[in-house]
Amino acid sequence: MELLCVRNVSKTFLDHSTKVCAVLDNSLDIHSGEMVAIIGPSGSGKTTLLNLMGIVLAPDSGEILVDGQKVNGLNDKKRCQMRNRYFGYIVQDFALIEEDTAMQNILVPTLYSKQKKSAAEYRRIIKDLAQKLQVSDKLKTKVKKLSGGERQRIAIIRSMICDQQIILADEPTGALDQENSVI
């Protein structure tokens, strides 16, 4: 069964008084363990499609199923619960709290996750990911003192800390140098 199923979704926005179609009749299936890349030029609707897939936005038409559950028509509380259960996000602008340390930022999703682990287990996961992404020495550093690439890697770790089944990444390597974008 598909973990994420997007069927004929469309989304329009109003730009002043003009209706702009950001996504038109898109469909895709993603199975557990699959990696899918959506590519296209700036302004082609990639971020909007990710927001539809991650149930941040509701489609104007079409349907979205997450782990076989239809998302269309769910109230805000149920949509939020589903997002927290299934999705990790890496957004273009990192969405990190500047005054907090990298570690504090990484731990934010654990406050909302139903998949509670022990503090020791979270430390083990963070240590492993930070080592792989070469930011072990930055975990106690305030985010405002990190480079763009370091912030990006902290955002990547944050998206993975709760073992989410689906990671949605909007330009996840945009701030990384060539060496680190391969990791």
Where would I find each of the regions flagged by the language model?
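Conserved ABC transporter NBD signature motif
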Residues: 62-70
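Conserved ABC ATPase signature
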Residues: 142-146, 150
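Conserved catalytic motifs of ABC-family nucleotide-binding domains
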Residues: 163
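Short coil-to-helix segment of the ABC ATPase nucleotide-binding domain corresponding to the Q-loop/switch region
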Residues: 99-109
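Conserved ABC ATPase "signature" region
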Residues: 70, 119-138
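Helix-to-loop junction immediately C-terminal to a conserved catalytic motif
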Residues: 54
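Catalytic Walker B motif of ABC-type/P-loop ATPase nucleotide-binding domains
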Residues: 167-170
